[in-house]
Amino acid sequence: MNRRDFLIKQLKGAIYLAASAAGLYLPRSVVAGVPAISQVKASHIGVAKGGPGPATRAAVGLLGGMKSFVKPGDKVAIKPNMSFPHSPESATNTHPLVTRELVAMCKEAGASRIRVLDNPTQRAERCIKTTKDALGIFNQDMVHALVNQDFYKPVSIPEGKYFKETDVMKDVLKADVLIAAPVAKSHTMTGVSLSMKGMMGLIYNRQTMHADYDLDPAIIDLCSLLKPDLVIVDLIRALSTNGPWGPGKVIRMDTVIASNDMVAADAKTVHMCEWYGQRFEPRQVDHIRIAHERGLGRMDVENLHVKHIEA
């Protein structure tokens, strides 16, 4: 996708805002059928600069630490990007040291079970190898590439407007805490692939979302069901072009973003990074805008309190 295609793809967002520029800052109840922002939980964002492990721990620390999200005895599901058999330098997968730090913090918080999960698009064991290696011999059994339908359970999506049912990983449905840990990368169909787009890696048949639905609204339907308690965006490197597979232009950011709001996390990532050679506003990404309108979170990061730290 080139810059012109990105703008065309996201034109609806620009038209929406042009029609009511102030709507981004007013309670969303002024727009028919849209929940007011006051009905959405308070959104917090932490941005840490540093290496993968230290920045991950520091970013979560800005939100009160992992114990604010994981309680003793909790079952935790962590969803990084593990779809490709590529090195961290490609920025197509979540940096394994980010994932390792999340696992360590969850163990420190007293989690009774931790699962690191994905449904890779390519050969499963090759895709998850770098993550398993990073976790070490005692934690490798936490990492699973679930490609068999037996690991999934059919569920309905009560708040789905278009995408109303799917098969979700049983481990996710059993989890007390869901942590999304995407790498920041571009995407040929949705502009970017971050925490919301990444939820597609927790269902069995995501191809139907591509083939049978308008993808951006379908993503929001799925996210109305799968709502991460904590989002960690790996912005150590960002794949700013030719995602999600690469190879493309990789930008070194040495940053990790943490938030309790998947919309805010994705919006902050879009705002911070260059995509396709230029800058975009979160509202120009359809699924971010739609999520904001439907009350799943906030894209108006300029109105949120963002904490920063050097790790």
Model-flagged regions — what are they?
Residues 1-311:
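N-terminal and secondary-structure boundary signal
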